Amino acid sequence: MKDILLITPPFTQLNTPYPATAYLKGFLNTKNISSFQIDLGIEVIIELFSKEQFTKVFAHAEQKNTILTDNSKRIFALKESYLNTLDAVIAFLQGNNATFARQICTDGFLPQASRFQQLDDLHWAFGEMGLHDKAKHLATLYLEDLSDFIVECVDANFGFSRYAERLGRSANSFDEIYDSLHKELTYIDQITLALLHEKIAKLQPKLVCFSVPFPGNLYSAFRCAQYIKKNFPNIKIAMGGGFANTELRSVSDKRVFEFFDFITLDDGELPIELLINSFSNNMAKMPLFKRTFLLQNNKVVYSNNCNKPDYKQSEVGTPDYTDLYLNKYISVIEIANPMHSLWSDGRWNKLTMAHGCYWGKCTFCDISLDYIKIYEPIAATLLVDRMEELISKTGENGFHFVDEAAPPSLMKALALEIIKRKLIVTWWTNIRFEKNFTADLCFLLKASGCIAVSGGLEVASDRLLKLIDKGVTVTQVAQVTRNFTKANIMVHSYLMYGYPTQTEQETIDSLEMVRQLFQIGVLQSGFWHQFALT
């Protein structure tokens, strides 16, 4: 029996756990509150993409007579080839049987459908000897073909890193999600709920907490909560996470609380501690809540009657990945982009250098939210203590610092502490392209194990950067990216188009500016996002 069950609902990343539950478990350890965490997403994926389960997928599609497109007919015709190779491909992408890469790269070994029509120039992307990455790329296309079959023939909501995302994106109204929750279970629902039942029956938690980071996790969180309410009615259920923090700050539809007892906002440590303490005290007459929505007298109320401040970052403990199946995550290479591979290939321990953003002025960012406006850096010595603890527990020495924007002064202190302790680590993070990233600092960061940074060039126009209050100029960005590149640190830039008042000519000029930055070699990766007001 555990006090708390922490759940990440399907789906997030394939290659590494989303860090929220590990952060919370690390904190709960400091309070001697027993907890267990599960990443339902990776568990569903591993169950689904197996020879045994996919045999059922093919049979289900045939029985329902949904194999209608040329692509799905081709995949079904090749089903024996898929079933004979599926378990071996998954094992390879989990880091087992490295020699299988040579077989995967053999022409005609893997069955191929429409995804292979988009095949990059493999020699350009991987060279003569990049067999392992080439094999991962081919195996990824193979899985994407099977994913297409699921979407076309079995469950249209499926996606590797999201499920029923469209429903989550319409969160201004609960009607569509509510209606979907009263329809027949989908194929993925059935797998998800079977795994959930097994965990809850074994652990018997007092409180189940769903961390919902993205719209593509929302439906599954509600479906799981619905199942718990029906089958384990004595268990209390809470929701938090990035989606709640941004989209549910003014929730008022009481139907939401048919599924969840509580919705907590912003940092989750203190709100969860108060919830579990109130259960232990049999819900005292005046229970204390921190930034929590609940139903009282058939009305949605927001309760924030606890005066205790949130815990300092030095007090929340080291993230704890115990309970998660770290050896089951799948490393994939979807496209031949070096930065994209950091997001999807390999397992990273995740840490935060500083809570919030030290700049906190960009006009496109919701700087009213606590996780952005409350800036609190963590001492470099404590950060490296946590890194050493995670290395000893996970066996992995790769770190992704998931800051909004890591501060240069703290990055310098971190690098010096890593070098002082003679640690061999690999790390990367998000930054602002500001002038404090001198050539000397970049070489120091490289010496400590920094391999990549990502930051926002946004609209690549000085007028618009000033309007955004980004605090940088295009010239400054070019100089800083040059400093990183000279130190052999890869640079990825987030780019934006369609910003209010941006003219057609400014858009063309920004494209040309980015092209030149790539041409001179100071940017190695970039991604354009269309500006959207939410």
Pin down the residues of each PLM region:
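Glycine-rich beta-alpha loop elements in corrinoid/cobalamin-binding modules
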Residues: 11-14, 19-53, 82-131, 138-142, ...
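Conserved, mostly hydrophobic/aromatic
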Residues: 28, 357, 383, 455
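Flexible glycine/acidic-rich beta-alpha junction loops that bind and position SAM and/or redox cofactors
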Residues: 37-49, 244-253, 411, 463-468, ...
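N-terminal [4Fe-4S]-dependent radical SAM core
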Residues: 177, 188, 299-350
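Short helix-capping segments at alpha-helix termini
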Residues: 229-235, 284, 419-424, 518-522
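Catalytic cores of alpha/beta
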Residues: 251-252, 441-442, 501-516
